[in-house]
């Protein structure tokens, strides 16, 4: 890669790190395996005011754009693709966290989340499985930020 581009990336990463160095939300988010400083900063910047969701995860998921679109016809309800409403950067950050967790399979292989992902991948395909995992991670993040608690890997273990 071009040296100037690498230098520019490094400068931008340092600026981001300086901006969020005292941010409690970023530190909480970095306790999740697969979440780096850029992902944590992105998620924290878009979720500063969780009170606007009134403790309702469904509203939070709709804000991110990871809920299925709904098509009604008389008494039939069809669920379609995710809505993709909301900030694309935030949705991308959550998907990147999901992909990071999948990559960390040595550390996360016995987690229910990853087991559910693998099962859903064989049943429905990788795209749907990643979105399902993303939604579960978003729920974890929502609860963590609401309760001001770090990530607890003990809660993820299969029983």
Model-derived features: positions:
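A residue-level signal for conserved active-site and pocket-lining positions in enzyme catalytic cores
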Residues: 5, 94, 137
